[in-house]
Amino acid sequence: MAQEPPRKQKVVIVGAGPVGSLAALYAAARGDDVEVYELRGDLRDPTTIPLNFTKSINLALSERGISSLKGSNRDGMIEKILNDAIPMHGRMIHGRDDGKLWEAAQAYDVHGQAINSVDRSTLNNALLDELERTPNVKLFFNHKLTGADFQSNRAWFERRAPGDTPLPGSSNRVPEIEVSFDYMIGADGAHSASRYHMMKYSRVDYQQEYIDTLWCEFRIPPSDTGDFRISPNHLHIWPGKEFMFIALPSPDKSFTCTLFAPAAHYAQLESSPQKLFLSFDANFPGVSPDLITPEDLQEQFKENPHLPLISIKAKPHHYGSNIVIVGDAAHAILPFYGQGLNAGLEDIRVLFDFLDKHDAFDLNASLTARRESRRAAFQAYTDQRTADAHAINDLSKQNYLEMRWGVKTPLYKIRKSIEEALDLYVPSLGWKTQYARVSFSTQRYSDVVKVVHRQGRILGYGFASAVISSITIAGILAWKIPGRLSPLPALQSTVQLLGHVWTKISPKNT
């Protein structure tokens, strides 16, 4: 049997958002012919941005995302993205006591590391510009994936460009094209068409959950002098037990803000403008009228959509050697850890690390050999990445409670202070906060969960030992000085405190 002549592989990428665009850069750098198909119009066109971006929450770019971008070896692109980013060194918690407004800063990291607030369009435009300069990449906008055959590796797209006329005699059908490929990467978001078609071939365990929280975007404008109205180097949080309001800085000196609240609360706010203003005054002191006028508050609440939050888990993330899904298509997560973008970009780095490890781009190998290498790489990717995707999904849900309420509690501050002190003064222990491990390292998410649980157990046992020692000393003193010292009140309060602290710092609550 004659050996197949070597040739380039062709990869079809569905979705031209940040994750799909980075996947295209990685594949192109390895010699593949790349075609990127995007349902929407060219995202760089300012006239199409309002139509395309149903989600304009500023993105938080941290170490995982940055290191994955660097893996593309496009230094100029990365420099542009980071130059336009605004570093946030911590949270700024806002509140009011006895009628007086207060704010309290909480640093993210004892070593001064920061996460970066980036504009969604700035990031996407930089990636698309880089793709357009890459000779073995073709971009196709206004193309909707309508079908896929992962046995013959063919896909069908409807071309939906403005001005296209329906086919004669059809019921508003538009022209459809057929595309062949060696493999497909699905990066088309939470409501992924590529995942939908993959599930016809692969037995996918799929879980979708909408939490009882809606979100609506607001904007704090620049001051009259054209400056930021509040500190630009913090993520600002107005926490509440059932809801919260956050603000992230933007390059134009404004803040992109988001109200997260249950659907029932939104229904109350929609009933009258007065209820909206009173709710903000009671729960988010200092926002209106100080930062947003009541008129703007009402207009933005009325005009901007009230959108749900979706959480998705799926396994496996691939089918054979034919398709792999990444980003929100594989694991849509809640935005409360700022890891949605970072996890998606990290998917690409991890995926191509496995493809490289299995020699899937060896031009000297036959197509059959490369197909088997790709199959093994996709399987290894699924085996590792599903565990990590599920871990950050769960961590993001847990962090919602912390942001709404935990950041104000003394016990949260105590544990954070202890862990940061150990990190700073005894670095040989390798002790770090959960937030630092998630945001300022590339440690696997699933490993972060294991290590943080172990740290929680150690802290709990250490605290218990300290309390038991105190009780023992109190008992000895009471025995030595009878009649002068009754240990009972101290014992009762200590036991109560121990039980309360243990429930907060034990592993199931970390």
UniProtKB/Swiss-Prot annotation:
Pfam families: FAD_binding_3. InterPro entries: FAD-bd, FAD/NAD-bd_sf, Kynurenine_monooxygenase. GO terms for biological process: 'de novo' NAD biosynthetic process from L-tryptophan; anthranilate metabolic process; kynurenine metabolic process; L-tryptophan catabolic process; quinolinate biosynthetic process. Pathway: Cofactor biosynthesis; NAD(+) biosynthesis; quinolinate from L-kynurenine: step 1/3. Its EC number is 1.14.13.9. Belongs to the aromatic-ring hydroxylase family. KMO subfamily. This is Kynurenine 3-monooxygenase. It comes from Aspergillus oryzae (strain ATCC 42149 / RIB 40) (Yellow koji mold).
